[in-house]
């Protein structure tokens, strides 16, 4: 497994303000490929998926530890169902003690399947993570899978708008208005709001015009391998 850093930009400061650590594997073509499809592939048991997700999490956190404070805030993906497995909790407590992680604002980014987890269980897991000093983000809001009800009850620290809300937003006024409404909601609730999947200057300008504070996407650069 190979950790890659994808920067998150502050649109008011013009600076890199956070990073998302993505985990890749080398496919048959020799290129680095996303692990997500493997985690959701049919035919794998829940235990096998959780074990792979834990390997990804460990890879990401160890890479952040080696980064020696390069970033103050880091996002790492987590499949919500992995929190149902006890090895996650023993692992996360151990990894949080890695050098450099204690001073970092660590955000676990719950992937779009978070709506599949029982709401009470999700809330309980989130409280336990916050007790460990870990913040919570909801990924892919607007994808049609991420439930607004679950998001509201979870009360995350960050929300990431799905790229489907960003793609061609400069040509779609209703889409731009929705991004602006979400940005206003996030500001009112003191929640960080990030638009992901920005690929063109026009999309970036539309996101800025919608008052979105943070952005991420290939327009700024591709994920880069970490040491």
Each model region followed by its residue ranges:
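Charged helix-capping and loop-helix junction motifs
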Residues: 90-94, 121-124, 173-180
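A short, well-structured catalytic beta-strand-centered motif of the EAL phosphodiesterase domain
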Residues: 2-40
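Catalytic core of bacterial c-di-GMP phosphodiesterases, primarily the EAL and HD-GYP domains
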Residues: 48-121, 197
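C-di-GMP signaling machinery
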Residues: 1-2, 29, 39-49, 89, ...
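Glycine- and small hydrophobic-enriched segments that form the cores of compact globular domains
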Residues: 19-24, 31, 40-42, 47-51, ...
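Conserved ATPase "switch" residues in P-loop NTPase domains
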Residues: 130
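EAL-family c-di-GMP phosphodiesterase catalytic domain
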Residues: 10-15, 24-30, 80-82, 109-116, ...
């Amino acid at each position: 497994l190979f950790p890659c850093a994808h920067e998150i930009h502050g649109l008011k400061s013009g600076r890199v303000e956070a990073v998302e650590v993505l985990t890749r594997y080398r496919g048959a073509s020799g290129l680095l490929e996303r692990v997500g499809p493997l985690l959701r592939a049919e035919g794998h048991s829940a235990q096998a998926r959780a074990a792979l997700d834990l390997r990804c999490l460990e890879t990401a956190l160890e890479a952040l530890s080696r980064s020696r404070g390069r970033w103050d805030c880091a996002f790492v993906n987590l499949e919500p169902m992995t929190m149902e497995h006890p090895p996650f909790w023993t692992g996360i407590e151990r990894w949080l003690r890695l050098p450099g992680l204690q001073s970092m604002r660590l955000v676990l980014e719950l992937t779009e399947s978070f709506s599949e987890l029982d709401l009470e269980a999700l809330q309980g897991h989130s409280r336990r993570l916050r007790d460990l000093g870990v913040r919570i983000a909801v990924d892919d809001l607007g994808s049609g899978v991420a439930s607004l009800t679950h998001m509201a009850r979870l009360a995350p620290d960050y929300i990431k708008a799905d790229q489907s809300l960003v793609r061609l937003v400069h040509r779609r006024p209703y889409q731009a208005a929705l991004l602006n409404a979400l940005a206003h909601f996030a500001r009112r609730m003191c929640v960080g709001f990030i638009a992901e999947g920005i690929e063109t200057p026009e999309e970036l300008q539309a996101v800025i015009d919608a008052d979105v504070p943070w952005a991420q996407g290939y327009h700024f650069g591709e994920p880069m391998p970490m040491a």
